[in-house]
Amino acid sequence: MFRLRDFEYYNRTVFLRVDLNSPMSNGKIISDARFRAVLPTIKYLIESGAKVVVGTHQGKPYSEEYSTTEEHARILSELLNMHVEYVEDIFGKYARERIKAMKPGEVIVLENLRFSAEEVKNATIEECEKTFFVRKLSQVIDLVVNDAFAAAHRSQPSLVGFARIKPMIMGFLMEKEVDALTKAYESEEKPRVYVLGGAKVDDSLKVAENVLRKEKADLILTGGLVGQLFTLAKGFDLGRENIKFLEKKGILKYVDWAEKILDEFYPYVRTPVDFAIDFKGERVEIDLLSDEKRLFDEYPILDIGSRTVEKYREILLKARIIVANGPMGVFEREEFAVGTIGVFKAIGESPAFSVIGGGHSIASIYKYNITGISHISTGGGAMLTFFAGEKLPVLEALKISYEKFSNLLS
């Protein structure tokens, strides 16, 4: 795959696809983490004299976070300490004329790419090439830099459509993500421990099955709803209240799949030995083997218990590779953040090379000032897809582009 330093950029127009899709409240972006992650790439292109055309999506149609990219241009202006213009168009005449008029070192931000219907559905590279987005924009750009790792599991025009039309290059963030995840996945250093929590149960099951079957993991620690699912699959009763919740979330249908994984890899999948319930507004820890587990019938499980944290901590401190995705409980409530803080702090203290991803995981790391993680991934779904052993469309497109245009480097 092409890397950023492979090309000269002076006076060349670069379409820079990033993922600045950020949490919003009352129409305002409340986290600039994804902006900061792509700054090295943008600064390098500016310093190299490129004309930088930034493209990103924000939210999904009809969602509260679906908005224009005017705010994104403003935040980039502040972070870069220069004027970054918001262009209220994507590939129409106005956008194309504005791109043609750009000067070296200038940066503009196109309108939310998902305002174009072509950008909302996944399609093959061949289909993406035929879109108006790719056909029109390719007339006014020279190179494509893709730094949108968080969207790497999607196959949409702005992400893969230019691969055979223009040289498509990894940005610094994409490069860093691919290198870190590959290092964790391919490592022979043992023990290799995967920590799977949160609510993305089906994705986590795919990861567990893949890394155990391909002998990429030596142990899997579970928490969050993933931990509850595997606990059920082991035959424990989590009570009426919690079963009802799991059913409502559509998680009970995965019990058979979890049982199948346990049948094949039982010693390698660890589940919580205790849970914390919300007992009338207070944290109460219940051992799975105690009589108090009857309280599961009436009170919701919101975290793993302290004994589980201690057992997981011992394992993590001896690990050489750690991959983690998803919190251990409802960390937004301080009394139920014990599991997430304890496990993530142990990962930070471990000598292991560690990778943590997922929006909620990252939010908890920043909220509780957890340090010592080797690599914090910007991709949740993309990271899970990678460790599930599935192909990421954007990485495949980068490989195709390299094969097509590698003669440019000779």
From Swiss-Prot:
Gene3D superfamilies: Phosphoglycerate kinase, N-terminal domain. It holds the Pfam family PGK. Pathway: Carbohydrate degradation; glycolysis; pyruvate from D-glyceraldehyde 3-phosphate: step 2/5. InterPro entries: Phosphoglycerate_kinase, Phosphoglycerate_kinase_CS, Phosphoglycerate_kinase_N, Phosphoglycerate_kinase_sf. Keywords: ATP-binding, Cytoplasm, Glycolysis, Kinase, Nucleotide-binding, Transferase. GO terms for cellular component: cytosol. The keyword Repressor does not apply. Its main location: cytoplasm. PROSITE patterns: PGLYCERATE_KINASE (PS00111). It is an enzyme of class 2 (transferase). It is found in: Cytoplasm. ATP binds at E332, G358, G359, H360, S361. It catalyses: (2R)-3-phosphoglycerate + ATP = (2R)-3-phospho-glyceroyl phosphate + ADP. GO terms for biological process: gluconeogenesis; glycolytic process. Its EC number is 2.7.2.3. Homodimer. This is Phosphoglycerate kinase. The gene is pgk.
